[in-house]
């Protein structure tokens, strides 16, 4: 069983990318579980046809400790198992703690069955606080992929996440598997992301072009592969799935200084 965490700044379409990636992997014969680790609880919406899934934390609040697995785990597109950890009540508590509670509960309830090929953690990535770093810190996820684009804040967040990976890689087995570019159609975007990934000592594992097919599929509460399986964008996600499944480049990243990051941005014309 490979356990992967997908990180990236808020709004970069991590959840969309993760769900479309898992749809590609399930077509390749893999059994998958997706654990949403974002308080928005939207990590499994496209796999469940838009059903708002009850989160682990909401279930615990309503039912107490005596929770059955089928009340927090739903089966979605092509048999993908879906869980949302959820978040605390606004203004109270720490969302990161919710991730810890949820993963521990899934382990206790036997969700991590031997037939699973992949478990994905879809994690809010702006804040690499202790709780959100939990899949890295506790050694749950061995592979990290960072979703980024050619925008400055996306790269700033990706560099910060790399610092978190570097910190925990020394004590655990976690490694960076690569950068996934979710294109924003920025000038020189491919070249910039490729240079950024290489500077970290990693790779740009796939460049996902911007496409209206993604929005159409989302409006219909489906992944692109389910909604329009023959379109070009569906093939992009299939290619991403193939590359992730066949990936053998796992590194401890070498995060860059703020000055070096800005230098790379200048070299590619993003800042003057």
Swiss-Prot record:
UniProt PTM: The reversible ADP-ribosylation of Arg-97 inactivates the nitrogenase reductase and regulates nitrogenase activity.
Cofactor dependency: [4Fe-4S] cluster
UniProt EC number: 1.18.6.1
Cofactor binding remark: Binds 1 [4Fe-4S] cluster per dimer.
Gene Ontology molecular function terms on file: 4 iron, 4 sulfur cluster binding; ATP binding; metal ion binding; nitrogenase activity
Catalytic reaction(s) noted: N2 + 8 reduced [2Fe-2S]-[ferredoxin] + 16 ATP + 16 H2O = H2 + 8 oxidized [2Fe-2S]-[ferredoxin] + 2 NH4(+) + 16 ADP + 16 phosphate + 6 H(+)
Matching HAMAP family: NifH (MF_00533)
Keywords: 4Fe-4S, ADP-ribosylation, ATP-binding, Iron, Iron-sulfur, Metal-binding, Nitrogen fixation, Nucleotide-binding, Oxidoreductase
Protein's recorded name: Nitrogenase iron protein 2
The family this protein is said to belong to: Belongs to the NifH/BchL/ChlL family.
Function according to Swiss-Prot or TrEMBL: The key enzymatic reactions in nitrogen fixation are catalyzed by the nitrogenase complex, which has 2 components: the iron protein and the molybdenum-iron protein.
InterPro entries xrefs: NifH/chlL_CS, NifH/frxC, Nitrogenase_Fe_NifH, P-loop_NTPase
Binding residue positions for ATP: 8-15
Modified residues (ADP-ribosylarginine): 97
Subunit structure: Homodimer.
Residues that coordinate or bind [4Fe-4S] cluster: 94, 129
Biological process, per Gene Ontology: nitrogen fixation
């Amino acid at each position: 069983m490979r356990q992967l965490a997908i990180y990236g700044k808020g709004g970069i379409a991590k959840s969309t990318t993760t769900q479309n990636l898992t749809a590609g992997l399930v077509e390749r014969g893999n059994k998958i579980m997706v654990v949403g680790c974002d308080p928005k609880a939207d990590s499994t919406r496209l796999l469940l046809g838009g059903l708002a899934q009850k989160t682990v934390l909401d279930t615990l609040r309503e039912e107490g400790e005596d929770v059955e697995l089928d009340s927090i785990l739903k089966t979605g597109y092509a048999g993908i198992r879906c869980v949302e950890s959820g978040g605390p009540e606004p203004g109270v508590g720490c969302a990161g703690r919710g991730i810890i509670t949820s993963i521990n509960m899934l382990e206790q309830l036997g969700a991590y069955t031997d037939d699973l090929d992949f478990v994905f953690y879809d994690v809010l990535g702006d804040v690499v606080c202790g709780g959100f770093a939990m899949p890295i810190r506790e050694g749950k996820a061995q592979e990290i992929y960072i979703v980024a684009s050619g925008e400055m804040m996306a790269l700033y967040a990706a560099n910060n996440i790399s610092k978190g990976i570097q910190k925990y890689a020394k004590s655990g087995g976690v490694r960076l598997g690569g950068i996934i570019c979710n294109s924003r159609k920025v000038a020189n975007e491919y070249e910039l992301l490729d240079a950024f990934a290489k500077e970290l000592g990693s790779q740009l594992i796939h460049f996902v072009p911007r496409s209206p097919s993604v929005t159409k599929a989302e409006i219909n509460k489906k992944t692109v592969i389910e909604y329009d399986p023959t379109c070009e964008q569906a093939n992009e996600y299939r290619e991403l799935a193939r590359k992730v499944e066949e990936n053998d480049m796992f590194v401890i990243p070498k995060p860059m200084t703020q000055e070096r990051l800005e230098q790379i941005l200048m070299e590619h014309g993003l800042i003057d």
